[in-house]
């Protein structure tokens, strides 16, 4: 299905029938990604002992009905909001934009700490997604102001699809990189790492606070100057997608909570003209 859109004075053609999914498959019976020591996501047949119902056709029931247990922040692709850091509850699904968002996809190689940093000070073995790397990778010719950025870290190993990050220190954003995204007006960030901050960072959450516009130590939602921003973590960006301009759609269920499982979709533009 072809559509023609006008964005920032530029006419764009896009095939809405062929999106590329950036969501990791969460296989309850197989290998699956997880982070921060969370248990595996799991499912089991729902049972009502009083009624004698067991939600499994294999076990003789009339239909399948499963009880699913997972930690959205740690099991698979998820989208979160400023409510991740505040006393007041904010549901991520209420913040996720409806429709398509102008986006750019960039590929970067995380770098050793140098002139850029975070809080607490990165360890020598840490690897950072830096402002410098983002500036180098940013597409030169983008037909619109990107409101979303998708970051693919290199090397892009297929093992990311089911990696257990527990006990590891995956790459994370430098505070300079987070500030760059904010300065460029990016409201929606998609990354293929489990967190934009260091896994164990003494609770600082520096990049999160910068991206959501939440001052250090503040826990009131009213203090967040970018409460309409979202961060999507643990995505996977296939190699078949070239760096450049796209349209992003964030699909999420209407579940309460500051993070929800999500399915980011990228739509390639078939043409554009100013």
Question: At which residue positions do the language-model features occur?
Answer:
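Active-/binding-site microenvironments in catalytic and ligand-binding cores
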Residues: 1-274
């Amino acid at each position: 299905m072809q559509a023609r859109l006008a964005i920032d004075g530029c006419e764009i053609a896009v095939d809405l029938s062929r999106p590329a999914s950036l969501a990791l498959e969460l296989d309850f019976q197989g290998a699956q990604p997880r982070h921060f020591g969370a248990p595996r996501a799991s499912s089991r047949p729902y049972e009502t002992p009083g009624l004698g119902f067991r939600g499994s056709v294999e076990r003789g029931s009339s239909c399948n009905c499963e009880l699913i247990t997972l930690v959205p922040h740690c099991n698979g692709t998820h989208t979160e909001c400023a409510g991740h850091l505040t006393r007041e509850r904010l549901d991520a699904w209420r913040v996720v934009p409806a429709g398509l968002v102008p986006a750019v996809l960039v590929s970067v190689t995380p770098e050793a700490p140098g002139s850029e940093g975070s809080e607490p000070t990165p360890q020598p073995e840490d690897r950072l997604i830096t402002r410098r790397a983002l500036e180098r990778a940013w597409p030169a010719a983008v037909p619109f102001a990107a409101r979303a950025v998708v970051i693919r870290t290199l090397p892009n190993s297929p093992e990311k699809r089911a990696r257990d990050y527990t006990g590891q220190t995956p790459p994370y954003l430098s505070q300079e990189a987070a500030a760059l995204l904010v300065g460029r007006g990016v409201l929606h960030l998609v990354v293929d790492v489990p967190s934009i901050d260091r896994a164990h960072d003494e609770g600082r959450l520096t990049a999160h606070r910068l991206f959501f516009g939440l001052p250090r130590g503040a826990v009131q939602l009213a203090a967040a100057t970018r409460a309409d921003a979202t961060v999507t973590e643990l995505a996977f960006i296939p190699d078949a997608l070239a760096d450049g301009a796209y349209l992003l759609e964030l699909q999420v269920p209407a579940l309460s909570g500051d993070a929800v499982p999500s399915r980011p979709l990228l739509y390639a533009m078939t043409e554009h003209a100013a």
